[in-house]
Amino acid sequence: MIYRLKLTDDYPDSYWFQFKKEEISIVDLMQCQEIHSKNPLIFTLNKKISEKRLLSYNIFSSDGPDFISLRLATLLENNEEFVKEVQLLDATVIINGQSHYGFKVFNPLHFLSCIDMDKSESRPLLSYLPDGPKSFTKMVFRQDITKDFWMARCKENTSCIVISDKLKQFCIENNIKDIVFE
């Protein structure tokens, strides 16, 4: 089975970070190519929140890419198969002026054609490019995927990251409860 990388529904809106776009953009992350940067990606949050509760999550949302905690990053970095497929980029998180280190951003290094276009519902993102990028209102994943993988970027919708049963099982075994598998 294939699952979309999705945060738990109880992730509060007040925990959405702002992605500081400097040398790496969200578009760069959608290319499935290794990125070389000396500087970490920066995420900021300036709201009155419970920092302890916020930092109890393992995956976080932003107006750019999602990013993961030091705990989840360490678990994944120790998985040799996973790090062959996904680059983990350094990220610094700034919460109300206080910097936190050790966070990572997923950069899947390959695309996977995985959307069943007959069962999914989409429309062209640009009306003058009917065969170009699509905006999906309903995504149905193909059931005939035989490729052995951990995480990939969806070829038909590059903003979508998909994960495999292997990664789902890894998360369950390591008590990662912030990711919804649907």
Model-derived segments and their meaning:
Residues 1-182:
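Phosphate/anion-contacting hairpin/loop surfaces
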